[in-house]
C-alpha cells in the first residue's frame, strides 16, 4: 500500500460540512463542453471557502499539480480566493473543507465513489469520476490525464451563487468516445505563430480535452539537412519545438509533426538545387522517380523525429495534381496513376519504418483507387478530409476501413479565405463527419484550420475548434444548439447568451450571401475593385445581401463593445470577433456605396444642364466625409486593426503580403477620389462631365 493513500479517511470521512442540510439546491443548467457521458444533479452544493484547499495525492503530486493549478486559477478568477494546493503530508487531520484530486488505484477512493453510485469500470485512461455534495468534492481517475480532464469539467461546474462560489451537487462518470481528439494549425501558408501563442492554443484546447495538436509544415521547419528551404527569420527551430512539446506534455497534448513528403512542396522545389526531384520544373510535387527524393525525405525526418516523441508522423500526400504530368508520365501510362501514387506512399512508409511510428496520410488521392488500397501497409492511418456541410461522409471513410486501415477524420474549422468563419457550415461538417467516423470505427478526429490565402486570424476559429473537441469526446451526433447554449458559459464564463447572439449575428453575412447564391470566398469579395466591370457586376449582385450583412455585423459590434466585460475568460478573443464584424461591415458598405456612387454620377452625367443637381450629386460622391472617402477610410482603418490582430498571434514574417492588399485597395479608392474631384473641376470649367465608364462607374441605373 502506498503511503499517500493514508490520508483518505480524513478526506472522505472526517471532512466537516461546509453547508447545512437545509441549503437549497443550486441545480443550475450545467452548460458543459464537452458534455459528460453520465450526469446526475442532486440537491445541494459544495461551497468553496477561503479556507478550502486543493489536495492531490502525495505520490502523484508532481504530475497532478498542473491539474490542481488550473483549478486554483479558475477559482481565483471567479472569486478572488487563493486556495492552497497540498499533498498528503500537509493534510495531517486538519478539519478544513477540501477539494480532493485522487487516483482510483486507492481502494478507499474507489469504494467511496461506488457507494455514491459511481462505478470506475470502463472509463479507461482518459475518463474520470466526479462527485460533489454539501460536504465532498472529489475528482478521481485512473491516470493523471483522466484527472486533468475531470478538473477541466469541474472548472466549468463552479458558479457564483448568492455571493459564494459553489459546485452543484453532481455525480459524473465520463470518458471519451474517440481516443484522439486533435486540432491542426496550418503554419506554412503565411502566418507562423509565435511560441507563446502556440502555447496559448494548446492551453485553451486542452481545457476542452483536446489531446493532439498538429503543426502542418511544408517548408517552415529549420531543417539542418535542407538549410535553404525555411525562411530563417521565422522558421520553427528545434529549440521552439522542444519547448512546445514539453509544455504540451504537461497538458496531455501530443504534438503531431505534419511534414509533406509528396505534394505541397513548392517552396522547396522552386529552388534550382532541387530541380532534379521536381515532378515538373519549380512545381509542387516531389517526383517518385528519383532515389534522391527519398534521401531528402529521410533527411528531413531525421531532423524532425527526435523532437517529436509522440506515436505519429503525418506525411501529407494530398493534392498531388502534377503527378503523371512530368517525370512520372511514362510510369503512370504504364501502370496507372493510382499505383504510382500508392507505391510512393508505401515507399515513404518503408523509408520511415526505423522510427517505429504510425504514419498518417491525407485520404483524398488514395480514395480514387479503392481497389489498390491493399498496397498500403495496414499500420498506416488514413485521414480523409472534407469541409462541406454534407449529410454523410461514410463514402470517404468506409473504403479505408474496408481495406483494414485505421482512420482519423478531418473536418474543417472554416477559417480560411473568409472574413469570418462560416460557423453554420463548420458545425454541420464537424458534427456529421465525426458522427460517421465514430460509427465506422475511426480512432480520432483532426479538426483542421488552413491559411490558403495567408490571411486567417486563428482567434476567429474558437467556436468551431471547441465544437470539434466536444464532438470527438461526446458519443454519436453532437447537438449544435446545445453547444451554442453552453458556449457563453463554457468559453467566456458568461451567464447569458450575449456572445452566442454576437456569433449568430456574424454568421448572418454568410446566410445573406447564400440567399443570393453567391458562394465566392468572402476574402476574394473583400479585395475586388468595385470600379472594374467584373467588380461592378459583383457589387450589384451583393447589394441585395449587403443590408442583412451589415445589420448583423453592426448588431454584433454594438453588443461586443457594450458587453466585453461580461467575458470573464478569453476576453481577448472578442477583439478578433470585432475585426470580423468590421470586415463584414466594410464589404457590405462597399457593395452599397458602389451602387450609390454609380447612381449619383450617372444622374449627374444625364442631367449636365442642371448645375445644382450635378453639384449635389458630386457632393454625395467625393465631398469631405462622402462615400469614396468612407471606402478609403474603412480600408486603411482595417489595415491597422488587421496588423494588430496578426501581431497578437504571429511573427511579423509574411504580414506585409497581406497588408499590401489593404494598401492596394485603399490606393484604388484614393485614385477614384482624385478622378472624381478632377471631374468636378472639369464640370465647373466646361459644364461637361467625363463619361461614367471612363471613371469606372459601370452600373447605369
Description of each model-found segment:
Residues 1-9:
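Bacterial N-terminal signal peptides that target proteins for export
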Residues 8, 109, 147-150, 193, ...:
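Short helix/loop capping segments that flank catalytic or ligand/cofactor-binding pockets
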Residues 8-17:
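Bacterial N-terminal signal peptides
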Residues 21-181, 432, 455:
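Contiguous, structured surface segment used for ligand recognition
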Residues 32-35, 40-42, 48-50, 123-126, ...:
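Substrate-binding groove of N-acetylhexosamine-processing glycoside hydrolases
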Residues 58-60, 189, 388:
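A generic structural motif
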Residues 74, 115-353, 360, 409-411, ...:
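Feature activates predominantly on carbohydrate-active enzymes
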Residues 103, 217, 449:
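Short secondary-structure boundary segments
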